[in-house]
Amino acid sequence: GASGLIAFPRL
């Protein structure tokens, strides 16, 4: 979710 993207913004 968004928290995951914030924790690991590296895509």
From Swiss-Prot:
Protein's cellular compartments: Secreted
The organism of origin for this protein: Gongylus gongylodes
Keywords from the named record: Amidation, Neuropeptide, Secreted
Similarity annotation: Belongs to the periviscerokinin family.
Main location: secreted
InterPro entries registered for this protein in UniProt: Periviscerokinin
Modified residues (Leucine amide): L11
Role this protein plays: Mediates visceral muscle contractile activity (myotropic activity).
Pfam family, one: Periviscerokin
Domain of life of the source: Eukaryota
Entry protein name: Periviscerokinin-2
GO cellular component: extracellular region
Lineage: Eukaryota, Metazoa, Ecdysozoa, Arthropoda, Hexapoda
